[in-house]
Regions:
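Short acidic-aromatic low-complexity motifs
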Residues: 2-35
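A solvent-exposed, acidic/Ser-Thr-rich amphipathic alpha-helical stretch
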Residues: 23, 27-78, 82
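Generic preference for well-ordered secondary structure
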Residues: 9-10, 14, 18-20, 41-45, ...
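A beta-strand edge to alpha-helix "cap/lid" segment located at domain peripheries
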Residues: 5, 58-126
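Charged, low-complexity, helix/coiled-coil-prone segments
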Residues: 1-10, 44-51, 100-106
Length: 126
């Protein structure tokens, strides 16, 4: 259950992912000029990847979800928020294995302007 504005935003973010509504997630939660820095090795060039703008984010997240498949969040911890930032760590499993991830979102006008992603595979397929 959401108890704070940041947690509500996070819960909505996961809901978009679980429903497969990546376009909705990007359009409603990321600024038009948003930047994602990702460690996931899913593009033709090695990571880290710097992805800019909604169109590129949509393409990246589609590849990312194809790579991961269904995601099962096992734990969420170190969740923190301020008026312009949200950060958290989580453990999840997917078809690529078990991951420890961390994300930091810098917010502008209630949307993600900068998304910093960190990840380490701790077991499984990847």
């Amino acid at each position: 259950m959401s108890t704070t504005p940041g947690r509500k935003f996070f819960d909505e973010h996961l809901d978009y992912i679980f429903k497969g509504d990546l376009d909705g997630m990007i359009d409603k939660q990321y600024t038009e000029d948003a930047v994602l820095i990702s460690p996931f090795d899913i593009l033709d060039t090695p990571p880290p990847h710097i992805v800019r703008g909604r169109a590129a984010l949509k393409a990246f997240f589609r590849k990312y979800m194809d790579y991961q498949g269904a995601i099962n969040v096992e734990s969420l911890y170190d969740f923190a928020e301020t008026e312009d930032a949200i950060s958290f760590q989580a453990v999840f499993t997917s078809k690529t294995g078990k991951w420890v991830v961390g994300d930091a979102w810098y917010m502008r006008d209630g949307m993600i302007a900068y998304h910093f992603s960190f990840a380490h595979n701790i077991g499984g397929a990847a």
